[in-house]
């Protein structure tokens, strides 16, 4: 298999900055498509993490933003294809906006320790947003698949701006018809131990302590509104199985039908200038552990 390409972004393609988030980023137009370039901070692995998780999602059949490795003026990063087209009257409504609109007292501006960001509140907001039960079930099932993906790759940054609904306004005769669907999963840079140095990765592999590492991280979704820290992504799925089995169990059964090797093979085509062999071995071991834990939860 050929290596994943590295898209070279040209300055004349830039069409505007993106204010959301903490990292330098901008929109550019390539062949009539809107892409978001996100610069990877030195030594963080944010670029390869985004690419690998996008490929893991593709193999697992989970809807996720299309991501390519990219470079701009010698600065490494990744490029994410826009899934909300303003030319088609499409708008992304972020989770914090949804929760603030349907959960009493929810603070959409709270950036850290937002303990009201719970599975229960997410489910409540979605059920109030969509009057038809079939639509509610479809949205919640899709979100459950995203949370299973988070657990598989150790994504600890599923905060309330990192999921949402794409709304489209269509003019029909004398009325405006609104359609809404779950946005593809996006923003997976905080995954797969990307923040570790290779020395630390090697030590974890040598000690066989990958499970301890996988269970150490705290996510951005909370189990209870009184908790001080978000729940670990693996533990969140366990909570979901107990609280919302109709959504989480099918997501786990779906994952169980995906061969582990296919998920692991997603790292093979990352160029070594972006991801070392030690890092690739670590990521494979990480997913071996999380896949085993998750598939054991499936009936």
Task: Show the residue positions of the predicted features.
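Aromatic-acidic/polar surface patches that form glycan- and anion
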Residues: 46-47, 141-142, 276
